[in-house]
Amino acid sequence: MKLYIMDACAMLALLRNEIGADVVADIINAANNNKLKIIMHKANLLEVYYDLVRSFEKSVADKILAEILNRPIEVNSEISDEIFLEAGYLKAKYKISFADSFALAQAKVSGGALITSDHHEFDIIEGKENIEFAWIR
């Protein structure tokens, strides 16, 4: 079964109905039909949540978070030694954000494709690490 790793920017694109939202929606619909699996690290979900809190009242952000958690997305709240070491390595080597290091490490360790639009962060990494990118735009 195909595995995707959800980056915060991809989920935010869906929530904001930005360019690429249709790609994210299609992937989530496929997961609803058990055609693929989606994992999102809790560090990336935190990025989504704090963006929601900044944009709306906390009660609205909490409601949207609950809706996200009802989608067919497995939230990984664990930091295995393998994820820990890979995230630290990637953050140091590429000077990326803390949360982005977890998304990349999750994708690299699990072999899943990272659903993202973060070209400014990840273009330098594509082709240099064993990470597949699923660009939404």
Question: How would you name each of these model-derived features?
Answer:
Residues 32-35, 72, 95, 111:
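Residue-level detector of structured alpha->beta connecting loops
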